[in-house]
Regions:
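Intracellular juxtamembrane helix-capping segments at the cytosolic ends
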Residues: 25, 118-131, 315-328
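Helix-to-loop junctions at the C-terminal end of transmembrane segments
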Residues: 53-66, 262-275, 359
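C-terminal transmembrane helical hairpin of 12-TM major facilitator-type secondary transporters
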Residues: 275-320
């Protein structure tokens, strides 16, 4: 598939732009005299919009083609990002009422989420269109690795650029989706429309997508749990002051990102391995990793546990995407990709709410639940494999 390199760059640029906001959202909220829950609202909103829009974009791309929807998505992210940067630049100068800032930031983030939902959905559907079933996991892993690089690059560069002004990273990263739009226009071929009377739309309850949806939800839920709870866990369990804990948290999250990418690179290099095998292996490794986390006795052990868990989740990500693509017909690829993508969005919504509630009961509970969840995913995968063998 000759378009894979372009898709990798497109996803890297757009993910980096999305994640750069996380590096400055806290300082922006404080500078505009807003409250911490306002930051949580703007981040959680992205998950809500993802759930709502991913299936829509997937179905739309089945009907009108992948390129127009992908181009609309990346352009929309770029323009919406410019709107966000412009408002924050304006707000930092005149300090408008908090309710106005909240409304404008929520609106801009919602628009970004609306258009971003199209990018992973259509990218995965495009791979499913172009790549035979036996090689889809490898290509999904390449795409996932590029997104992982974006997850690391965005906050790192965004934090560095913030010394030149809180709106500077937003202006800089708004350019990246516009560059991605140029790549879409120049390198992604426009496929002819398929003459079909009606494109089938897999439902949320579609039994064919049940396992990949469970895997997508649990994995994204656990990723968000790690991001939200790690800083608190470092302070409470290692008894560090806030400044040092922030540094330790940053180091651990950087290592987690590297392990996440490494796992997907390994998947991309292995040919002919069925997605179910990666799901089973990844869920087993993630179970062990989170088990180490909640039983940890030192900072080194904590970092090691998170790295093991991240490696396991890195194996799972491309597996559930390829599993979904292999489970449906050619005409259903976009809708299936959107359905599974919306399950990821649901994990983003529920993750922060459930994990912080569990943390309030006991700091180890979020990680105990994550470990049990991945153990259950392994059981579900084995059961699915047994059902396929016995036609149950």
């Amino acid at each position: 598939m000759k378009e894979i390199k372009s898709l990798m760059v497109i996803n890297l640029l757009c993910v980096a732009a999305m994640m750069a906001f996380l590096a400055v959202v806290g300082p922006i909220i404080r500078a505009l005299h807003m409250q911490e829950w306002h930051a949580g609202l703007t981040v959680a909103l992205a998950g809500v919009v993802w759930v709502v829009m991913a299936r829509y974009w997937g179905r739309k791309s089945d009907k009108v083609g992948r390129k127009p929807i992908l181009l609309m998505g990346v352009l929309g992210v770029g323009v919406s990002y410019l709107l966000l940067a412009s408002y924050i630049d304006f707000a930092l100068l005149i300090m408008p009422p908090v309710v106005l800032s909240l409304g404008m930031i929520v609106l801009a983030r919602a628009l970004i989420g609306v258009f971003y939902a199209a990018i992973p959905t259509v990218s995965n559907a495009l791979i499913a269109d172009k790549v035979v079933a036996s090689e889809r996991t490898n290509y999904m892993a390449k795409l996932g690795a590029s997104s992982g690089f974006g997850m690391i690059l965005g906050p790192a560069v965004g934090g560095y650029l913030a010394v030149y002004g809180l709106s500077t990273p937003l202006y800089a990263f708004a350019i990246l989706p516009l560059m991605a739009a140029f790549l879409v226009y120049k390198t992604i071929p426009k496929a002819p429309k398929k003459h079909v009377e009606e494109v089938p739309h897999p439902k949320w309850s579609d039994v064919r997508l049940r396992l990949p949806m469970i895997a997508a939800f649990l994995t994204m839920y656990s990723v968000v749990t790690s991001q939200v709870c790690l800083g608190f866990f470092v302070i409470d369990k290692l008894a560090l002051d806030p400044t040092l804990s922030a540094k330790v948290t940053g180091y651990i999250l950087s290592l987690v990102g590297v392990c996440f990418i490494l796992a997907q690179i390994i998947v991309s290099k292995r040919q002919g391995v069925f997605p179910q095998k990666w799901l089973l292996l990844g869920s087993t490794i993630a179970t062990i990793g989170y088990g180490i986390v909640f039983m940890m006795t030192s900072g080194v052990m904590l970092g090691f546990g998170f790295c093991i868990a991240a490696f396991g989740m890195g194996l799972i990500f491309p597996a559930f995407q390829a599993f979904a693509a292999n489970s449906v017909s050619e005409a259903e690829q976009g809708a299936a990709a959107g359905t599974v993508s919306s399950a990821q969005g649901l994990g983003i919504i529920i993750g922060p709410l459930a994990s912080t509630a569990l943390y309030g009961l006991n700091p180890i509970f979020p990680f105990v639940v994550a470990s049990i969840a991945f153990a259950l995913l392994g059981v579900f995968t084995l059961r699915h494999k047994a059902c396929m063998t016995s036609s149950c």
